[in-house]
């Protein structure tokens, strides 16, 4: 398995189904999609072309679902896609073309209500704008006690020696969704 894509899920069915429309056609025998349902017990997820793990209780953040995904991931590389975000039709293709370094930085744009916004910042600490060689993650996991900035803290402990970037914007970060962890 070359790539595992991990999606933490919490009450975002409409967004997740839209993401599935883009992601499922890109999945191959070398690419797995892992959705970790954080206490919602959303049965509609079971119809997707993904390994779905239903956690019994809501953890209140993305850390625990991401850790569960990391624990079951079979890919040599790990990508994270948030359930309310969107990707381009060639996301997987572009990622697979670049699997040769410890970290692959992904170019991205913000979107509000499906409208793509201006130029992204030069640097972002989020895990969704990186693809990680699983071997450099090793036993590093997200801290369950952090509800904000867990991405930044995780990335401080991952020590890549080599990296590359994908110049074309293949990831769209959803800003301003009510109920989002980043919106409070």
For the regions a protein language model found, what residue spans apply to each?
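Short, well-formed alpha-helical segments that are part of the catalytic scaffolds
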Residues: 12-25
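Acidic helix N-cap motif at the loop->helix transition within catalytic regions
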Residues: 15-17, 40-49, 86, 90
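A conserved acidic beta->alpha catalytic loop
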Residues: 35-46, 59, 82
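Glycine-rich, basic loop-to-helix element that forms the pyrophosphate-binding segment
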Residues: 56-73
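Short aromatic/hydrophobic "clamp" motif used to bind/position activated sugar donors
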Residues: 78
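Conserved donor NDP-sugar-binding/catalytic core segment of glycosyltransferases
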Residues: 86, 90-116
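Conserved nucleotide-sugar donor-binding catalytic segment
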Residues: 117-184
């Amino acid at each position: 398995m070359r790539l595992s894509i991990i999606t933490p899920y919490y009450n975002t069915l409409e967004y997740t189904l839209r993401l599935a429309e883009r992601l499922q056609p890109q999945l191959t025998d070398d690419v797995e999609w892992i959705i970790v349902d954080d206490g919602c017990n959303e049965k509609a997820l079971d119809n997707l072309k993904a390994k779905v793990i239903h956690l019994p209780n809501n953890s209140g953040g993305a850390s625990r679902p991401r850790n569960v995904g990391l624990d079951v991931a079979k890919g040599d590389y790990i990508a994270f896609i948030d359930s309310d975000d969107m990707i381009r039709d060639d996301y997987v293709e572009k990622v697979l073309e670049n699997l040769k370094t410890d970290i692959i930085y992904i170019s991205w744009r913000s979107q509000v209500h499906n409208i793509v916004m201006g130029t992204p910042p030069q640097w972002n600490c989020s895990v969704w704008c990186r693809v990680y060689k699983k071997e450099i993650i090793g036993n590093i996991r997200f801290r369950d006690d952090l509800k904000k900035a867990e991405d930044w803290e995780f990335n401080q402990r991952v020590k890549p020696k080599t990296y590359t970037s994908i110049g074309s914007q293949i990831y769209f970060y959803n800003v301003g969704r009510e109920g989002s962890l980043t919106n409070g």
